[in-house]
Amino acid sequence: MEGPYGNGFEKVEGKVALVGGGIGIAPLYMVGENIENCDAYLGFRERPILEEEFGKVTSNVYTTSGDTLITDILNVEKYDYILACGPTPMLKKLLEMTEGTKTRIQVSLENHMACGVGACLVCTCKTHSGNKKTCKDGPVFWGEDVIL
């Protein structure tokens, strides 16, 4: 077994929202442990879990499940930074929501990876500075650079 690959979220200061969907929620717990003054927004397909755990490491925890999307309850302009991990449609919506605001966003992509060393190109993603390998250059990218 090898890993983890690539890079993590860059350290930021200010008011931060951690936004996770599905399996993208788990990586945000450790991020919450290392950032002061952050809120967690967690979206679940079914019933919410981990609320109590996130409550120990964040200021506030907001959850949605079922037909309500986590992006439906998030006001991006309340935050200096958003750190997000989850399904591509959620990340794409967050990029749209932050466009034209002062809020900066980092997204952790959930692309499939095969070799883990950048040779196979399975995990390639598009950015404004050319194609990048999620396993080597990511999986975390600044929102203004990545194209979803």
Segments the model singles out, each with a brief description of its role:
Residues 137-148:
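Short microdomains enriched in Cys/His and/or Lys/Arg
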Residues 27, 89, 110-139:
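Local cysteine-cluster metal-coordination motifs and their immediate loop/turn environment
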Residues 1-114:
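FNR/FR-type flavoprotein reductase catalytic core
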